[in-house]
Design a protein with these regions (language model features):
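Generic detector of short, locally flexible boundary/turn motifs and exposed helical patches
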Residues: 21-24, 31-34, 57, 85, ...
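Hydrophobic packing positions characteristic
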Residues: 75-177
Length: 177
C-alpha cells in the first residue's frame, strides 16, 4: 500500500510540474534532461492539437501569445476528459471562465473561440437527421421544411465567420451576426 501511495504521489508531482514548470519543482529522482523532454512533448502536443481545433485563433496570435494561452490553460484549468475531441470544449471553458484577458487581447476572442468550437462540434457530430415521413422527391414550395439535426442558432457581436489575419475588427457590428 505504501508503494502505491508513493507512486501516486510521484505521479501527482510529475503532472503538477508538467502543467506549471515555472512554479512547481520537478519530482525527486527524475533526471532534469528527461523531465525537459516530457515538458516539451506535453506542451508542444497540446499546443499543436489546440491550434488544429482553433486555427483562426492561432493564426491571429503571435507565438508568444499562443504559448501564453496554452500555458495558462495547463496551469489553471482542471480538464475533466482524456479524449482529444473534448479538449476544445475544455479550452473554451477555460477561456470563458478562467482566462484573465489582457488589455491588448482582441475584443472578439471569446466569440471567435466559441465559433471555432461550434464548427468543430458540428464537423465531428454523429447526429443523424430524422427523415421518416420526408418525401425526397416532394415539392419544395408546397412541402414542410425539415430542420437539420445539425442546425444551430448563434448570434455574435463580431463577424467571427470573417475574422482572419487580414480582418481583425476593432468594433462590433451594428447588428448581431
Amino acid at each position: 500500500m505504501a508503494d502505491s501511495k508513493s507512486f501516486k504521489e510521484k505521479q501527482y508531482a510529475f503532472a503538477a510540474h508538467i502543467r506549471d514548470p515555472e512554479h512547481v519543482a520537478p519530482p525527486d529522482g527524475i533526471e532534469s534532461r528527461r523531465m525537459a523532454i516530457y515538458r516539451g512533448l506535453f506542451f508542444n502536443n497540446l499546443s499543436s492539437l489546440l491550434a488544429t481545433f482553433f486555427p483562426v485563433l492561432r493564426k491571429i496570435h503571435s507565438d508568444a501569445q499562443w504559448r501564453g494561452f496554452i500555458r495558462g490553460f495547463m496551469q489553471h484549468h482542471q480538464a475533466e476528459t482524456p479524449y482529444f475531441l473534448q479538449l476544445p470544449q475544455e479550452f473554451l471553458a477555460y477561456l470563458q471562465t478562467e482566462f484573465d484577458a489582457a488589455d491588448d487581447d482582441y475584443p472578439f476572442l471569446l466569440e471567435l473561440a466559441h465559433y471555432e468550437y461550434a464548427e468543430l462540434e458540428l464537423a465531428v457530430s454523429d447526429d443523424e437527421n430524422e427523415i421518416q415521413g420526408i418525401d425526397p422527391n416532394g415539392d419544395l414550395l408546397t412541402g414542410v421544411p425539415a430542420m437539420s439535426s445539425l442546425a444551430r442558432a448563434f448570434a455574435y457581436r463580431y463577424a467571427v465567420h470573417r475574422i482572419s489575419p487580414k480582418f481583425l475588427p476593432e468594433e462590433p457590428e451594428a447588428q448581431p451576426v
